Amino acid sequence: MKYKDLRDFLAQLERQGELKRVAVEIDPHLEMTEICDRLLKAGGPAVLFEKSRGHDIPVLGNLFGTPKRVAMGMGQDSVEALREVGKLLAYLKEPDPPKGLKDAWEKLPVLKQVLNMAPKELSRASCQEIVWEGKDVDLGKLPIQTCWPGDAGPLITWGLTVTKGPHKTRQNLGIYRQQVIAPNKVIMRWLAHRGGALDFRDFTLANPGQPYPIAVALGADPATILGAVTPVPDSLSEYQFAGLLRGAKTEIVKCLTHDLQVPASAEIVLEGYIHPDETAVEGPFGDHTGYYNEQETFPVFTIERITMRRDPIYHSTYTGKPPDEPAILGVALNEVFVPLLQKQFTEIVDFYLPPEGCSYRMAVVSMKKQYAGHAKRIMFGVWSFLRQFMYTKFIIVTDDDVNIRDWKEVIWAITTRVDPARDTLIVENTPIDYLDFASPVSGLGGKMGLDATNKWPGETSREWGKPITMDEVVKARVDGMWTDLDL
């Protein structure tokens, strides 16, 4: 099913029992985090806090707290169907040349669909029904959560940050947390390799001393939100990809402050600039690792206007020890990653990011091994293929007889097929998440690969063990008598 905006999505969730309303007054300071954390860990519904203490605006939480709701947001009926999204992305990333006229004809609808998905710019939009400017700009009037007791202050978590580089034709959408430090100022925490930070760097080099335009959209439609966290090919904008998911063009509107374009149906939009050399120390905040992060310096975003729909909804989340909402997103997007990896490495059978691994820090891969040393090739391939995996610290590779989504089987493979000295690959001084305080240097650390495959000649001089399996005829015979055994 497709959704024109966030409210359309919420109405469908409510019809299916996937959204509950809370009429009791709840404090955005800590209380909402505790409620959403309990709901998520129980596989519970999204929640709309209708009365946020001290505010007139309701708060939406736990929206993508189950893989099912992530799939629904992408317009799919099931988590398994997300593989089709991955296949589409794999094709768009590296299109196969047609094998003949028939093949070209079959691929034509996909190509036409992509070409027709350029966003549609509107002259007026619902996200600009109400405008705060000048002294009316006050983030304190928004029910921004303070998530954990040790947090430095309120934190905007689900904002889609819109940026544009000086040499790019398309805009970039990214999700970066933003600490509120004044009624009209937030700290824009983006890592140096992320799209928004790269756009900002290129702009400052090309336009020294000039303020950099920024917009942040809160409460966009689900396809646009999820498009911002999906590995979209560089040749495709997130707005185009959202249009593909939705089956209709993404409607956008030009900001009132500058020329950036934002989702027309967004609930709330922050417009403004990053001024040259204005930075601030960010944090600490509880993060998806389950720890408070170190303080670091990032640019300050000064907000000149806040626009919104009538009766807006504030979309929020928290991050904490997994599982949290980013971890659940990782579980669902895992299915998108599989076809992308299989396109590049046809020997890969399955790929799994355990949610306990903070969304991306550990990966398990099963493969059809073809030669000695093959597992190490896959390790380096995963680390280098997608930007999402450059921070993956641990990769375990198994044969395709192992169900890598069952930890019992993975541990069996590790304990029976791994020699620590031979099968452990250590790579030093590689890019690591800045939030990873276990690394000896901020942003730089080691990676480890475990080869838990059966070993081939050249990898061992010993006769390799043969797994025990029961005769299929005997299994079938016992199946037939099982009911009569009354066991």
From Swiss-Prot:
Cofactors that this protein relies on: prenylated FMN; Mn(2+)
Subcellular location: Cell membrane
Membrane topology: Peripheral membrane protein
UniProt entry keywords in alphabetical sequence: Cell membrane, Decarboxylase, Flavoprotein, FMN, Lyase, Manganese, Membrane, Metal-binding, Ubiquinone biosynthesis
Pfam families, per the entry: UbiD, UbiD_C, UbiD_N
One Gene Ontology molecular-function label: 3-octaprenyl-4-hydroxybenzoate carboxy-lyase activity
Protein name: 3-octaprenyl-4-hydroxybenzoate carboxy-lyase
Pathway(s) where this gene product acts: Cofactor biosynthesis; ubiquinone biosynthesis
Gene Ontology cellular component annotations, sorted alphabetically: cytosol; plasma membrane
Annotated positions binding prenylated FMN: I175, Y176, R177, R189, W190, L191, R194, G195
EC number(s) on file: 4.1.1.98
Cofactor binding, per record: Binds 1 prenylated FMN per subunit.
Subunit (UniProt): Homohexamer.
GO process terms (BP): ubiquinone biosynthetic process
Gene designation: ubiD
Residues that span the membrane, as ranges: none
Residues reported to bind Mn(2+): N172, E238
Cited InterPro entries: UbiD, UbiD-like_C, UbiD-like_N, UbiD_bacteria, UbiD_Rift_dom
Function field: Catalyzes the decarboxylation of 3-octaprenyl-4-hydroxy benzoate to 2-octaprenylphenol, an intermediate step in ubiquinone biosynthesis.
Catalyzed reactions per annotation: a 4-hydroxy-3-(all-trans-polyprenyl)benzoate + H(+) = a 2-(all-trans-polyprenyl)phenol + CO2
Family: Belongs to the UbiD family.
Active site residues according to the UniProt entry: D287 (proton donor)
